Amino acid sequence: MNVAVAILILTLSALQAPPPNMSAIPAGDFWMGRVHFFLIDEVGWLERDRRDDLPAHRVYIDAFNMDKYETTNEEFARFAAATDASTPWYWVKGAVPKGEERFPVHDVTWFQADAYCKWAGKRLPTEAEWERAARGGLDRQKFSWGDGGLGLSGSDTDTQVSAEATNTKRAHVGSPTGPTTVGSYPPNGFGLHDMTGNVWEWTNDWYDRDYYSVTPDRNPPGPAKGVYKVIRGGGWSDDDDRNLMNHYRNFSDPSRGAPTIGFRCAKN
């Protein structure tokens, strides 16, 4: 092989490689939203169903990079030290609680999450990017690992598999009392950990119940304005299968943090 060609190939490979601790999410389209129907005895929440995940629609997303892990306390501490940003209330005198360095930071507002990502040279993912990444290449599936539910049948087998897959109350029969070390559970098909459970994750999008009726089919940016920001993925306190599904949409006040909400960053 010509030396110049070999150098060019190596250079292009290096340019295409994702940054450290990030996974490359390939460009492609996928079904976004709810693409299946529930039996009433499967979940029992149809009466209070917002139906904001309908209609299901095909969406194309350009290639991007996504953090493999939720942003940790120790990472946020470096940001706070460099920028004099405020720290979460549960830190002890402004310091990360001992032993929780690799836990996901939580009780941070959307604005704090946005500021961290920008400081790190990244950004918050759009809601569509988040769902594309969470699915891990599995289209039309309820969960990041496929269609297997979290103990829907009540069998010991289902519960055991779930406990090995995610940190959430539903999986561990009520045992979790908070988030756990990032990366404690197997990654999805794109190499991302804790896209289900541990903490909910802020996205860049404003929440609009009816956005799926008007969303563009390529790289939807989210609504131009709103009151709440979209959060995704479910958290350690969830005992409802619905909250843990790839398509499930939730929202929160961007000016308020919560013990169940954290974030991770994306990058073009």
Regions found by a protein language model. Name each.
Residues M1-A85, W110-F111, G137-D139, G148, ...:
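Short, compositionally biased
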Residues A24-I25, W31, H36-D41, W45-R48, ...:
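Functional-site microenvironments in short loops/helix caps that host divalent-cation chemistry
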